[in-house]
């Protein structure tokens, strides 16, 4: 785990809260990962930001649920992805996880789920996994 990830977990008291920047349950600290918010990792080096692991550019998400789900949303509905990202940027600026931001994120996720509940991948499996819905705390 990167040092910035550890620092943000501590600063935002994520283990004590028990949920990440999108309101997903945290079971194990090792499951958490850094998500690039403003400058995608693929663009960071060209902009002189190294790999972009900077506090102002990140949120902490549960890799197997919220992080993977967010990238699925990015691929399917860029507007919803940007709306969720905006809420997480706001939390980053505030320096804390805010219940109103988390509620707006939940509303966006529920809208995505209504629109894409029957979408399937190339292998015929539903794109929205049960854990994406069940492991939300908000």
Predicted regions and their residues:
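Short Cys/His-rich local motifs and their 1-3 flanking residues in nucleic-acid-associated proteins
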Residues: 25, 64-67
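Bulky hydrophobic/aromatic packing residues
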Residues: 20, 80, 134-138
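Polybasic, low-complexity binding patches
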Residues: 41-59, 66-131
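Short cysteine-rich loop/turn motifs with clustered Cys
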Residues: 2-33
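Short recognition patches in nucleic-acid-associated and regulatory proteins
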Residues: 28-48
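Cys/His/Pro-rich metal-binding microdomains
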Residues: 20-22, 59-63
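Positively charged, low-complexity intrinsically disordered regions
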Residues: 14, 36, 115-117, 121, ...
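Arg/Lys-rich, low-complexity, intrinsically disordered N-terminal tails that contact nucleic acids
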Residues: 1-9, 120-138
């Amino acid at each position: 785990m990167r040092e910035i990830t550890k620092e943000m977990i501590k600063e935002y008291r994520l283990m004590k809260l028990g949920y990440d920047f999108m309101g997903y349950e945290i079971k194990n600290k090792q499951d958490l990962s850094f998500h690039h918010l403003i400058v995608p990792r693929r663009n960071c080096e060209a902009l002189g930001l190294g790999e972009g692991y900077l506090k102002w550019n990140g949120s902490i998400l549960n890799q197997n649920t919220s992080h993977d789900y967010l990238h699925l949303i990015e691929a399917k509905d860029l507007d919803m992805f940007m709306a969720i990202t905006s809420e997480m940027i706001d939390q980053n600026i505030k320096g804390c996880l805010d219940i109103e931001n988390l509620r707006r994120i939940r509303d966006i996720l529920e809208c995505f789920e209504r629109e894409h509940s029957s979408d399937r991948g190339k292998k015929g499996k539903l794109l929205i996994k049960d854990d994406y819905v069940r492991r939300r705390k908000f």
